[in-house]
Amino acid sequence: MIPTLALVGRPNVGKSTLFNRLTRSRDAIVANFSGLTRDRQYGEATHGDKRFIVVDTGGISGEEEGIDSYMAGQSLQAIEEADMVAFIVDARVGLTAADMQIAQHLRTCNKPIFLLANKVDGVNESIVCAPFFELGLGDVIGIAAAHGRNINTMLDTVLENVEPEAEASEEDKAKGIKLAIVGRPNVGKSTLVNRMLGEDRVVVYDMPGTTRDSIYIEYERDGKAYTIIDTAGVRRRKNIKLSVEKFSIVKTLQAIDDANVVILVMDAQEGIVDQDLHLMGHVIDSGRALVVALNKWDNLDNDHKSYVKTELSRRLQFVDFADLHFISALHGTGVGDLYKSVHKAYSSATEKLNTNFLTKILEFAVSQHQPPLVNGRRIKLRYAHAGGQNPPIIVIHGNQTAAVPKNYVRYLEKIFRKELELHGTPIRFEFKSSENPFAGRKNAMSKKPEHPSRRANSGGKSINRRPRPKS
């Protein structure tokens, strides 16, 4: 399970700067959810082969009324949800009473605490870090978040006991497709989970997942195995009212990362809101297959339906690869159709791609529309091969590949998606500049390549297309 690192500290010690550094200056993936304290940001970061969620807790201000004023409400919850805590102090300001109060609270959390002294650039690091040993939190790691100083060393320490992401085991595969049902509060996630489990389900067992409060529910439908990652709390303890849907951003992000396919539920009555788009952005960043379900569709009149469809076509162009379903989870309308899209997306995301066919598609794409010139020289794209699954990663080798513009990458994605018949999954491209392995041979690009779909009639070896998934 992808771990969570909470950034904690007084205002202006550099939490947001470090957050942007770790997430490569991307905006918060999820922001401004109702019920969250100001300025809390959530993002995903990588260090080598390790991935983790970063939380900029915010909301720690003032020094007069004790720890409750610094870490009220959602900030305390973020620390509670986190697997690790980075306590950031200002090396230039030095140790303050507020730092000592925060440290006193953190010592009771029973979590790994890492003390980071920020802003050590231009000063004697050992001298400015020395006072913070008084906090009793162990070693002090000096960093300069604004300039990236010691960030990699700090991450080596923080992530030392975090395991790299592992491939799915045979045991996990036997449990079937993992579905994460995600969405804003009160869009109908609980109702959809119950409807998908249905009266004809075969529930093997319900067990708490390693994600706090998420439940992994194994079941069968039409002889096929599935595991729903339930973040909505439909099976919580009886003393928690089911009408009050708990919402945890960390829990949602972890569910997305652990899933094979994500069903994003939206409320048709409210239309598309920014929070929906933020969640979609995280699904794409995570490389997960996506199915979009617009719930409560039966509550709309025809004029409202027409307006919502227009808005969908306008605002969801960046996820036009995902199937869109209009459903009523309460009455079951359209819910069964979700499974066909789930299988189609899962098959596309996990299909093994043939190197020969990928190179033929690349040759065809280049013949139809060549890459641009860079400094008077044409970018050369020579061959392609698969680099991974879930999402499909296509590695393209050539010359000057670092200069391939984004609009040409979008063109390549369109061609590869069409020829590979990939539905419901993002595609990743990796470009590598390298020596041509076919040097000395006749360049296959010197003659106009035929369309990949006509390969079977070319006299060469046919490359079978991926079989279409059965619904």
Swiss-Prot record:
Q: Spell out the InterPro entries in the cross-references.
A: G_ENGA, GTP-bd, GTPase_Der, KH_dom-like, KH_dom-like_a/b, P-loop_NTPase, Small_GTP-bd
Where do the segments described as Disordered lie?
A: 432-471
Extract the CDD domains matched here.
EngA1, EngA2
GO BP annotations of the record are: ribosome biogenesis
Q: Which residues bind GTP 2?
A: 183-190, 230-234, 295-298
SUPFAM superfamilies per record: P-loop containing nucleoside triphosphate hydrolases
- UniProt GO MF annotations: GTP binding; ribosome binding
Write out the residues that bind GTP 1.
9-16, 56-60, 118-121
Per UniProt, residues of the KH-like domain are: 351-435
Q: Which Gene3D superfamilies match?
A: 3.30.300.20, P-loop containing nucleotide triphosphate hydrolases (3.40.50.300)
UniProt keywords (A-Z) are: GTP-binding, Nucleotide-binding, Repeat, Ribosome biogenesis
EngA-type G domain: from which residue to which, for each copy?
3-166, 177-350
Family membership: Belongs to the TRAFAC class TrmE-Era-EngA-EngB-Septin-like GTPase superfamily. EngA (Der) GTPase family.
Q: How does it assemble?
A: Associates with the 50S ribosomal subunit.
Cross-referenced NCBIfam families, in alphabetical order? Answer: GTPase_EngA, small_GTP
Q: Give a short account of what the protein does.
A: GTPase that plays an essential role in the late steps of ribosome biogenesis.
Supply the name of the protein.
GTPase Der
Q: Which gene encodes it?
A: der
